[in-house]
């Protein structure tokens, strides 16, 4: 993408961990589109990842912040507005985690302390972020806030575990807070329901590789990549989508509206023939 769709626009990008992450790809795409931004992640994530490389590549300041901590968020927003030279035009929330998934706990045997922690990081942090932005009047009119979701918020994907609940709440927060942000401040709030993507976080989901192949065979256009999601996010940040808000937008090659693909049927027929 070479169009300067975001020239003169300022923002914050949450969640860039490494080059495989969607937030990382989005930062690169926003930079290419002319936008300036602050990169942020939790201090522990900053130590684990390679975000300094991204900061140098995109000329973006890096400000550590725990997205579950309201004091951190307030300080982050204040510093971002100061360093970028004005109110914000876009924010990306690309944060999610489940200790239950990481530890292999089955959905029928969840650890509730872990559930609460994942809930706070993956979903409640989005409300805390928007509340801080709202109270500080930190967004310009016609600004755009985007969070990344997944179809498991609406359909059953057993191995996605309690992350499905987290994403469902995330989408609900986007609609509920998005109403007030739109009505009172003309700020857009949307979620993107992205194809399964082989990110560092996604690798923790059991059976992901098999599901990636299944989704690729099901989606008429194939799975959307992290880079393609980044381009889509740039479009949502741009002025071309000024009247798009409160939406959960499927960016999945058509997977979300296919019952079963002919490729899958043909594959099952072949297995039946082999078995007989």
What are the residue ranges of the model-derived segments?
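Conserved mid-core alpha-helix of short-chain dehydrogenase/reductase
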Residues: 72-75, 117-132, 228, 235, ...
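Conserved mid-core segment of classical short-chain dehydrogenase/reductases
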Residues: 56-57, 63-74, 78-118, 135, ...
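Catalytic loop of short-chain dehydrogenase/reductase
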Residues: 15-25, 96-184, 193-199, 216, ...
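Canonical Rossmann dinucleotide-binding motif of NAD(H)/NADP(H)-dependent dehydrogenases/reductases
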Residues: 3-40
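C-terminal helical subdomain
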Residues: 124, 191, 209-244, 249-253, ...
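A glycine/serine/threonine-rich, flexible loop-to-helix segment
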Residues: 52-53, 184, 191-219, 259-276
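Hydrophobic structural elements of the Rossmann-like NAD(P)H-binding subdomain
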Residues: 13, 92, 146, 189-192, ...
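Aromatic pocket-lining residues of Rossmann-like dinucleotide-binding sites
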Residues: 30, 181, 236
């Amino acid at each position: 993408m070479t169009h300067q769709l975001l020239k003169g626009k300022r923002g914050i990008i949450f969640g860039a961990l490494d080059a495989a992450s969607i937030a990382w790809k989005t930062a690169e795409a926003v930079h290419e589109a002319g936008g300036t931004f602050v990169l942020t992640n939790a201090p522990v994530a900053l130590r684990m990842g390679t975000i300094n490389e991204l900061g140098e590549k995109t000329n973006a300041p890096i400000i550590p912040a725990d997205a579950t901590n309201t004091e951190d968020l307030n300080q982050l927003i204040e510093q971002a507005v100061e360093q970028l030279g004005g109110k914000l035009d876009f924010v990306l929330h690309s944060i999610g985690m489940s200790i239950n998934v990481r530890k292999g706990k089955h959905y029928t045997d969840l650890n509730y302390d872990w559930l609460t922690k994942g809930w706070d990081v993956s979903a409640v942090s989005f409300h805390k972020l928007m509340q801080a932005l709202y109270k500080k009047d930190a967004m310009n009119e016609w600004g755009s806030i985007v969070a990344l979701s997944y179809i498991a918020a609406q359909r059953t994907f057993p191995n996605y575990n309690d992350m499905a609940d987290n994403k469902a709440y995330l989408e609900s927060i986007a609609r509920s807070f998005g109403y007030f942000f739109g009505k009172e401040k003309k700020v857009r709030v949307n979620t993107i329901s992205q194809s399964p993507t082989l990110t560092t976080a996604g690798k923790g989901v059991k059976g992901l590789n098999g599901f990636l192949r299944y989704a690729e065979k099901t989606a008429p256009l194939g799975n959307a990549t992290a880079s393609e999601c980044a381009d889509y996010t740039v479009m949502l940040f741009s002025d071309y989508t000024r009247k798009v808000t409160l939406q959960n937008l499927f960016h999945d090659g058509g997977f979300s509206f296919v019952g079963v693909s002919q490729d899958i049927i043909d594959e099952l027929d072949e297995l039946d023939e082999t078995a007989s």
